Amino acid sequence: MHTTYLKNLIGFESLTPQSNGAIEYIDDLLKEHGFKTEVKIFGETEQVTNLYAVYGNSKPNICFVGHVDVVPAGDPNLWHNSNPFKAHEQEGKIYGRGTVDMKGSIACFLAASLDFIKNNTDFVGSISFLLTSDEEGKAKHGTKEMLQYIYNQGHEIDFAIVGEPTCEKEIGDTIKIGRRGSINFKLAVKGLGGHVAYPQKANNPLPCLIRILNELTNIKLDKGTEFFQNSNLEVTNIDVDNNTTNVIPETATVHFNIRFNNLHSAETLAKQVEEIIKQHCQKHKLDYTLEYNSSADSFIQNPNDKIKEFATIVEKTLNIKPNFSTSGGTSDARFVKNYCPLVEFGLLSDTAHKINEYTKISDLQKLYDVYYNFLMETLNVTGSPPLLGMT
């Protein structure tokens, strides 16, 4: 059923932050199978659809956390079937926007959960879903707000699986147990514009900005840690609002981002960056404005018993020993970690957000097997049959 669920989910053009029927489809499906569900819409200008659904009323509560929203698909004519929101199956692969990020893992956990409930009437615990349509965008009214809401209603999650596409070369090779932080900067260096023939009557902000960027981009922020790669600064945009060649610009603006590990905080990095900017601007007798905001702090979890148990299930099911990692961008795991231990585990990441995003059907089966086996091991099923995928 995981392939059917995935094909159905791809059919919803759920561009962030819209559900466009995807969450409603899942809500109806889970209600049909005995889940207690609640759909909440948060936000005023951009309304975000969220779902919490739970089966069972005892502990532990194993929760799948995910998002149905997707990024734009680009030119549809570049896709195999000219329609990125109609699932296309070819040579053992399923193509469509959101296939790996992350409708495929949603489909696998749906199938695993419903099959588990059907096959095991004596299990102890609860299975739940927390889904949003606001992860790829601002992420203000999605998982973060829904977690606050369900905890205020008395719900508690004991362990979460976030279904982001984490694997690198084969299903099972990577489990995320943390993420780098992210901080965005906008720097405007303010000079005095004028004619290029009379530089003595102007103060060009660009030489100062170039020196600032040269120092910032050559800083070795750290050497990384056991689970984190080194922190990294990337310049993303430079603008002087000047298309002519004979005018010295008034202002030079740059945007840059730092992805940082747990050796730093957003505050310490902002202070370090501003000290460098201030020194150069004072030397060139220029003013500046600096804006920054952090969308996520870095975090790392010590692999506890439940995280290790999940890794053991992956290894037993797929005969591959997973690596613990913190690589990649930010995810909603940064909100979940404030409430319970978690792992991020899903499909391969290499086609996420790309034209002709796809997954192998065989990879869907592997992911389904891991999810199903974890439920079998965790929810105290007595006299259970051998785990899926094992001989």
From Swiss-Prot:
Catalytic residues (UniProt): D69, E135 (proton acceptor)
Gene3D superfamilies referenced in this protein's UniProt entry, alphabetically: 3.30.70.360, Zn peptidases
Enzyme Commission numbers on file: 3.5.1.18
Binding-site list for Zn(2+) 1: H67, D101, E164
Reaction equation(s) it catalyzes: N-succinyl-(2S,6S)-2,6-diaminopimelate + H2O = (2S,6S)-2,6-diaminopimelate + succinate
InterPro entries: ArgE/DapE_CS, Bact_exopeptidase_dim_dom, DapE_proteobac, Peptidase_M20, Peptidase_M20_dimer, Peptidase_M20A
Cofactor(s) essential for the protein: Zn(2+); Co(2+)
Top EC class for this record: hydrolase
GO biological process terms on file: diaminopimelate biosynthetic process; L-arginine biosynthetic process; lysine biosynthetic process via diaminopimelate
Domain of life: Bacteria
SUBUNIT field: Homodimer.
PANTHER family cross-referenced by the UniProt entry: ACETYLORNITHINE DEACETYLASE (PTHR43808), N-ACETYL-L-CITRULLINE DEACETYLASE (PTHR43808:SF31)
Similarity comment: Belongs to the peptidase M20A family. DapE subfamily.
Function text: Catalyzes the hydrolysis of N-succinyl-L,L-diaminopimelic acid (SDAP), forming succinate and LL-2,6-diaminopimelate (DAP), an intermediate involved in the bacterial biosynthesis of lysine and meso-diaminopimelic acid, an essential component of bacterial cell walls.
Record's protein name: Succinyl-diaminopimelate desuccinylase
